[in-house]
Regions:
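Catalytic cores of alpha/beta
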Residues: 78-88, 121-129, 146, 165-181
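Residue-level detector of anion-binding/catalytic polar loops
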Residues: 43, 91, 112, 132, ...
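Glycine-rich phosphate-binding active-site loops on the catalytic face of alpha/beta enzymes
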Residues: 92, 96-105, 135-144, 176-200
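Hydrophobic, well-structured mid-protein blocks that either form specific transmembrane helices
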Residues: 80-122, 126
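CoA-thioester-processing core
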Residues: 113, 143-154, 161
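Short secondary-structure boundary segments
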Residues: 49, 75, 96-98, 117-119, ...
Length: 211
């Protein structure tokens, strides 16, 4: 089911091929590192829903970037978290695993829905639950070989590899069938060192664009 938010989130993810995972970034550092990411070519910004300020941070970045970025929520465990993220303007909702009720609610709310999977059974459950993109998590281990073996059997949904992805192995995940990768500190390093973050982001974006 198409929606403007879902379509925008999928477009950003397909075009940039990287989702930045912003896990518990201190308040004073969130906007600066988000600015560097978006300026550097990474528009998909995931705020993990594992700290008190998460929903407010989603709203903050949605207001700051508008349609210049795709701001969503990750580490989503409950229907209530999905609903609060949607109300804050989130364009996508990432789950660590397959929670059928939460995934279905996310899809119903018009957010791009990305449940975490690692087995064929989980993949099939995720698809039935409304998954738009299958988050291969953790991705390394088992590594890109697993994805290359499984992805051809589930061509009706794209994969994003997250967890253990680095600038050195991300191309292998693209070659294995992932449309995108999710990366946290392996993408930008120390969020307080913006100069180094720019260099690291540029290196990852170069790999994504060349793959």
């Amino acid at each position: 089911m198409s929606s403007p938010r879902r379509d925008h989130a999928l477009q950003c993810l397909r075009e940039d091929r990287i989702m930045a995972v912003l896990r518990q970034i201190p308040e004073e550092h969130l906007v600066p590192i988000a600015d560097v990411l978006v300026a550097g070519g990474v528009r998909s910004l995931e705020i993990t829903h594992d700290y008190e300020r998460a929903t407010a941070d989603v709203a903050l970045l949605v207001e700051r970037f508008g349609d210049k970025a795709s701001v969503g929520v990750g580490t989503t465990w409950t229907v209530e978290q999905a609903e609060s993220a949607s109300a804050a303007g989130a364009t996508f909702c990432v789950l660590p695993g397959v929670d059928v009720e939460t995934a279905r609610r996310s899809a119903d709310l018009g957010m791009l829905t990305l449940p975490g999977v690692q087995t064929p059974a989980e993949i099939q459950t995720a698809i039935k639950s409304g998954a738009d993109v299958l988050k291969f998590f953790p991705a390394n281990p088992p590594g890109p070989t697993w994805l290359a073996q499984v992805a051809p059997a589930y061509q009706q949904r794209p994969f994003m590899a997250t967890g253990g992805v680095t600038v050195d192995n991300m191309a292998a995940f693209f070659d294995a069938g992932a449309i995108a990768v999710g990366m946290a500190d392996t993408l930008f390093g120390d969020f307080a060192d913006l100069s180094r973050a720019r260099e690291m982001i540029a290196a990852a974006v170069d790999v994504a664009r060349a793959s």
